[in-house]
Design a protein with these regions (language model features):
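Hydrophobic beta-strand-centered segment that forms part of the acyl-chain substrate-binding groove
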Residues: 63-101
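HotDog/MaoC-like acyl-thioester-processing domains
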Residues: 1-20, 96, 101-141
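Glycine-rich loops and low-complexity Gly/Arg-rich segments
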Residues: 45-47, 83, 112-114
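A broadly conserved detector of short glycine/acidic/proline-rich loop/turn motifs that flank catalytic sites
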Residues: 24-26, 35, 92-94, 106, ...
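Terminal targeting signals and extreme-terminal segments of soluble enzymes
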Residues: 53-55, 61, 66, 110-111
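Catalytic strand-loop segment that frames the active site of acyl-thioester-processing enzymes
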Residues: 1-58, 72, 76
Length: 141
């Protein structure tokens, strides 16, 4: 049948409730390799250039995890048990040494003790706020 309409979670038009800058270490992609991902795109400058990048890029799951940690620490009191779901769309790359800007909008109880949802947008500060993660939603208790 026909595909149904897509509902992308757009960030509200108001200013974010919170914003946090998360520095990414220069050696972060090399450290992240300890998780077992040996893709040379994250460590080999020549391979990265062949793939069309200026230099090796950070693992997407690393930026994904750093974002969830920033949201959890900022709006959920660091309590990971409150997270019910986390969804996002990878919108761009992160280079080691850059800074992630995580902007957050809280619905429901505003990130307090009750349940609700947080919409986030993540960008790379050093590249004129280039999008990194989009359509990001964290459902929480």
């Amino acid at each position: 049948g026909e595909r149904g309409p897509s509902r992308r979670p757009e960030p509200p038009t108001r200013a974010p409730d919170k914003a946090v800058d998360v520095p990414v270490r220069e050696d972060q992609a090399l450290l992240y390799r300890l998780s077992g991902d040996w893709n040379p795109l994250h460590a080999d400058p020549e391979f990265a250039a062949t793939a069309g990048f200026d230099r090796p890029i950070l693992h997407g799951l690393c930026s994904y995890g750093a974002t969830l940690k920033a949201v959890t620490d900022t709006l959920l009191g660091g309590d990971v048990a409150r997270i019910r779901s986390y969804a996002t769309r990878f919108a761009g790359v992160v280079y080691p040494g850059e800074t992630l800007r995580v902007r957050m909008w809280a619905d429901g109880d505003g990130g307090g003790a009750g349940s609700g949802r947080i919409v986030a947008a993540v960008s790379a500060v050093e590249r004129d706020e280039a999008p990194v993660l989009a359509d990001t939603v964290i459902e929480h208790t």
